[in-house]
Amino acid sequence: VTHYRITKDVHGESEVTKVDKDSLKNYSDDYHSTFIEVAKFAMLSNKDLGKKVNYIHFGNQCRFLLETHARSNYNIENVTDNAIKQIVSAYEVPESSESQVRRMLDTINSLSHGMSFNWDYVSQIPAKQIQQAARTLLWMLTNKDSQHVEAMTRNISGFMRICRTWQDDGLGV
């Protein structure tokens, strides 16, 4: 029996991919597939980043990842600025990187409501800022639990190596 996954890309086009046997063992498919999408978005070059038409939806995906992970592992219910102390403590974020984590939270939370009354503000957020938020999130998760991130991204060639270069340059850079 062969299994396939059908997803929509950022342009609204359907993508059909074969699902390998290891992926079928992962019971949290939404979390895993979202993790993969965010990781691929974080790895985009500046040239390819400019081609993303619907980059804003990655803010929601980042929030979904962080909320799911924080709630499941650290009983942190809301990943807002009010929970910054809990977040930096749970994820062992160095004090020097706290402001970058705060910017990441501000970015992903401002995008979590989609197109709404604040669309004028949201539409002004550049793709690079959202990508930096994604990189900060992925760095933070890697810093705390690199085995988790490696398991989630094992099919993305070079991800852990690239993620470590973000660490060397500072959070989300």
Report the location of each language-model feature.
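C-terminal lobe/lid and adjacent interdomain/linker elements of RecA-like ASCE P-loop ATPase modules
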Residues: 1-75, 81-95, 101, 105-109, ...
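Long, hydrophobic, amphipathic alpha-helical segments used as structural scaffolds
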Residues: 70-77, 119, 141, 145-152
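Histidine-centered, metal-coordinating catalytic motifs and their short helical/loop contexts
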Residues: 95-147
